[in-house]
Amino acid sequence: MFDILMYLFENYVHSEIELLVDEDELTKELTRAGFHQADILKALSWLERLADLQESDKPYLCNHAQQSFRIYTKDEMAKLDVESRGFLLFLEQIQVLSVETREMVIDRVMELDEASLILDDLKWVILMVLFNVPGNESAYEQMEDLIFEQPEGRLHS
């Protein structure tokens, strides 16, 4: 399923090509690209729930303190290793993620059918969430820079 999400993001969203709006046509396109029907339906459902998060009239989180600390559940810790959880905290500290967008990312990660997620895959989920939440253009650009920019020169002497 994650491969399909990456395919859609790279080929349609990130490349700014208009996404096919007809789900049947999109399903046929993905089938021609070699993806299985069941995985396609899961990926489209995942994207639909992501869109629902942004379109909801209700705030994603209610009554949260700005200085609160996120405690991960056992299932969340199984899917997000220490490095990934640390990266989420880092993104909050540099204000790429807000408390709300962090929770949206965790929500979308937990809906993936992967047992665990490596950091590079988490970065793509974060990018997908930020792309779909209005008003996060600057955060999206910062996240793009974190993914695509390669450090220049030597890191260590």
Curated annotation (Swiss-Prot):
InterPro entries linked to this entry: Smg
Pfam family, one: DUF494
Similarity-based family: Belongs to the Smg family.
PANTHER family per UniProt: PROTEIN SMG (PTHR38692:SF1)
Protein name (record): Protein Smg homolog
Organism: Shewanella denitrificans (strain OS217 / ATCC BAA-1090 / DSM 15013)
